[in-house]
């Protein structure tokens, strides 16, 4: 799928939110953390990722276009919080107590680990599997691991191995 072009107004809104959150964090933490690089190359069902060593935030342009206001209000500070935790505390659990504190106490945003965006436009083909209690849909990657004998996936409810079909 081709990456969509983001209107400049949306890119500016994202950058404005990033800068506001960063200024707020620098003020509350009495630091001068630099502005991270912002790119729109995230693919798949992830809304964004924070790359620590390159100090970069990658955002999903498809999900951004489909959920502009919520995306900017939630995903941008979420990913920035990962970078700020890394700068402030060192390497910590991705959604641990330091990240939660950074989100809620420093940035003033509810600490949610996952987004609730509709994924139809970014979801790839899935394969039907089942266990004793329900149907499951495995991604292409997981399905291929099962086919190659590299993985066995189990139902989180009944614990039974998932079977194709």
UniProtKB/Swiss-Prot annotation:
The keyword Metal-binding applies. Its cofactor is Zn(2+). GO terms for cellular component: cytoplasm. One of its GO terms (biological process) is response to stress. Disulfide bonds: none annotated. It comes from the Bacteria. The active site is at 79. PROSITE patterns: ZINC_PROTEASE. Zn(2+) binds at residues 78, 82. PANTHER family: PROTEIN SPRT. Belongs to the SprT family. HAMAP family: SprT. This is Protein SprT. It comes from Salmonella typhimurium (strain LT2 / SGSC1412 / ATCC 700720). The lineage of its organism: Bacteria, Pseudomonadati, Pseudomonadota, Gammaproteobacteria, Enterobacterales. The gene is sprT.
